[in-house]
A protein has these predicted regions:
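N-terminal [4Fe-4S]-dependent radical SAM core
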Residues: 69-154, 167-173
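Long, charge-rich boundary regions
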Residues: 136-179, 187-206
Length: 367
């Protein structure tokens, strides 16, 4: 059915460049590679999980290197180590414990608000310890190689975008229903059985829900790609936790400078943080970047981003998106946000696509 809905999804996999740039993802779909989160469960962690945070992070760094070596061996030999019965101190559980430590002085995102969310003190995101899911379904509107995508939409966000098109869930932390790790796993397993090629954690944004998502992987058993779909304003510690268990990254790259980001999304040091995290993701797995072209922001944002990507992430693909429309606060405060109070023009989109072509960026199959 999904190929009838999206014939371009089938065409995308006939493109050798798409296959090359998403090689491991395609192999997981074909059950010829193992999703990283499953391998993380097989790597023994030789430290009590009640050790100090400093000790746990030191072991995590060592285990991340061991995991990279394990992944290389498994991929080269096409051998999958089976789960070790009773292996409670494994690499995934170490990550879950560290995520709980972060939750107690919350710095999942680079706002680093420091709320003790383990005792339901609300963070900047207005979330306590529980996660809420607004919806979950097979999504046929994602990038062609990703559909059908098993999307799980989390409520709340760590950004304050004045133009947010999902503001009904991003600005309302009480939307949806409370779902714990086992519930997330049940949703993910059901989506995979229904034909999802990946489990797509999105929102809002998944960042404030990192602890729940990692804990859900304990209860997931299917060999299916784990996909992180985010604004990527993660702390470096969060990126370290995600690095070894996510196969594909679908990050936004919104702004080409810090000033536009602070004015329109209310975040500081945006370009420094997000460019750092894009490089970490690029070292970790396969990446499709999303860039939303915005009116009057081609020169200050679109072109600098495309130049940076071409120089630093040459093998990733970029979805150059023309879907911007003035929503949320922009709709009601047009004078204040006059620069983005209209849709993007065809001329602006042409400049973006021509720039991408000139820089050698591969964008058409995912745009």
């Amino acid at each position: 059915m999904w190929r009838l809905v999206r014939p371009d999804a089938k065409r995308a996999w006939s493109d050798p460049e798409v296959v090359r740039r998403l090689f491991r993802y395609r192999k997981i779909i074909d059950q010829e590679r193992t999703a990283k989160y499953l391998l993380a469960k097989t790597l023994e962690c030789d430290i009590p999980l009640d050790s100090s945070s400093e000790e746990l992070w030191n072991v995590h760094k060592e285990d991340s290197q061991r995991f990279t070596q394990l992944l290389e061996r498994v991929d080269s030999n096409d051998e999958v180590p089976g789960p070790v019965p009773g292996l409670e101190r494994n690499f995934l559980n170490l990550k879950i414990e560290l995520a709980q430590r972060i939750l107690a002085d919350c710095h999942f995102c680079e706002r680093r608000c420091g709320a003790d969310r383990t005792h339901d003190e609300l963070g900047w995101c207005k979330l306590g310890s529980t996660s809420r899911v607004s919806s979950a379904f097979l999504h046929t509107g994602e990038e062609a190689p990703l559909v059908p995508s098993g999307t799980i939409f989390f409520s709340s966000c760590c950004f304050g975008c004045v133009f947010c098109q999902n503001n009904d869930i991003s600005t309302n932390p009480n939307s949806g229903r409370v779902v714990g790790p086992e519930g997330i796993a049940t949703i993910a397993e059901g989506l995979f059985r229904d034909g999802a090629l990946n489990i797509n954690y999105v929102g809002g944004d998944p960042i404030p829900n990192t602890h729940t998502i990692l804990a859900s992987q304990v209860h997931q058993t299917s060999n299916v790609t784990q996909l992180w779909n985010s604004n990527l304003y993660c702390s470096e510690e969060t990126m370290q936790l995600l690095f070894d268990v996510f196969d594909v990254w679908l990050p936004d790259f919104k702004y080409g400078n810090n000033e536009c980001a602070e004015r329109l999304s209310g975040v500081k040091n945006y370009f420094d943080v997000v460019s750092r995290n894009h490089l970490i993701a690029y070292d970790s797995g396969e990446v499709i970047i999303r860039h939303l072209v915005m009116p009057n922001h081609v020169e200050c944002c679109t072109i600098p981003i495309l130049k940076w990507v071409s120089e630093n992430m040459p093998d990733c693909m970029v979805n150059i998106m023309g879907q911007y429309r003035p929503e949320h606060r922009v709709r009601h405060e047009k004078e204040r946000f006059s620069d983005i109070a209209r849709p993007v023009t065809s001329q602006e989109m042409e400049i973006a696509s021509n720039t991408a072509d000139e820089l050698g960026i591969y964008w058409r199959p995912v745009s």
